[in-house]
């Protein structure tokens, strides 16, 4: 299968799924997705990591994931580039979360269902109004917390709403996300890094 060059990457769901499915020839979609998210998260985190042991541990995890993904970094790197391009084209979306649900990877045993991004955006628009704007002006920072963050749609939509309302979210807002599922937590981490929202990459 020919893999497109960076110049040809458009950042579409079809692009991502075509390449992703190529990795699923001998493994389940869940196994491939899990290793892909781990590899992406390790790549991002180690750019900023200063602790040698943690950096080495992530390198080992990255190498294991790439081996499971076929041993070639080309396709995982292209998939990461597609995600980045998709968010450059339209930062106001939950690119990975939408693909995750399209691939039926959600766990109904955990009650896992990703709220559509448009619903998250509507909630952000309702919540972030004059009161929040005034608090942001009066305080050192305000916090947005999601204790079941999934791929980060609530946090990303909040960041985009702050930006639209003229609030300097990079200096005035602390975004906190957590989830019981490590894989979706990594999805959130990757999207927050590649989206125009502030991040603490620890």
Task: Name each region found by the language model.
Residues 188:
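Conserved SAM-binding loop
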Residues 185:
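Short alpha-helix immediately C-terminal to the canonical SAM-binding loop
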Residues 2-148, 152-165:
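Class I S-adenosyl-L-methionine
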Residues 175-178:
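Conserved SAM-binding motif I beta-strand of class I
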